[in-house]
Every structure is written in structure tokens, then in C-alpha cells.
Amino acid sequence: MSRVAICPGSFDPVTVGHLDVITRAANMFDKVIVVVMTNSSKSPSFSAEERMSMITKACEGLDNVYVDCYEGLLAEYAAMRDAGAIVKGLRAMSDFEYEFQMALTNKKLNPNVETVFLTTKAENMYLSSSMVKEIARMGGDIREFVPDVIHNEIINRLQKERN
């Protein structure tokens, strides 16, 4: 099995929950590629480049973590990068049902890739990028939900949307 793993997501924006999963994956694999998946049917608050920049800042010090962006099938991306694993964080059973279906699909499309599920820490079970954005837009404090190094960047963008 390849010791390369992919941590895919929209990361709009990256949260401490995402960072926890990325850090744990970095301890399990030789190389972890955090891939910002783009979807033309969605309207993210941050551009793909901004999300990549925030992830890079948040992952500073994790020497085996790399950041990339991709629009297309995750199974194809895994094959292009010779990744043997897709790492996904799970918050609740509702996450599992969707992610299990995606794991089976990715395995069908790329038999060389396995999906590894990491359960989130209890303190992050409720945390989502959508929740962080809503709190920030309403002027709430998001410090405990996002990495310190990108806090101001997120606040500045989302509070501008509010005004």
C-alpha cells in the first residue's frame, strides 16, 4: 500500500476539526496531500487559492503535509498522485452513511485506494465550516473553532459580507 494519503474537502474555511484530522493523518502516513476539491455548482465564500493559502498556514510545521486543488473525480486524483488512502473525518452517523457510499464509489473507480475514516474528537463533533461562517457573519467569536493563524483573515472576509 502506498504511504501517500489524501485528505479531501472544501475547507470553506478550514477549522480546528479539519486540522485535527490532517494532523492525525500526518502521523499515520509518509505524505498527506490536503486537496481542496472544487465544485462548479457550489458558491464558496473563499476562492480555492484562498482556501489553499489558509490550509498551508494552518499546517505550518507539518513537514509531510502538502496542499493542492482539484476539480474532478477524487478517485482519479488519487491515481494521479499514487495515493493509497483517502482520509475522511467523521462527526456523526449521518456523516458515515454518506462517506461510506462515497468510499465504495471511489473503490469501484480506483481499486488501488482505500478510505480511512477518523472519528472526530468529541469537542469537535458539532463543528462545521458552515457553522463557523454563520457565527462570523453574525459578529460572533470563532477563535476556538479556527486555527489562530487564519482567524483574522476569516473574520475580515465574513464580516465584510455582513456589512
Please provide the spans of the model-predicted regions.
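Nucleotidyltransferase catalytic core that binds NTPs
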Residues: 1-163
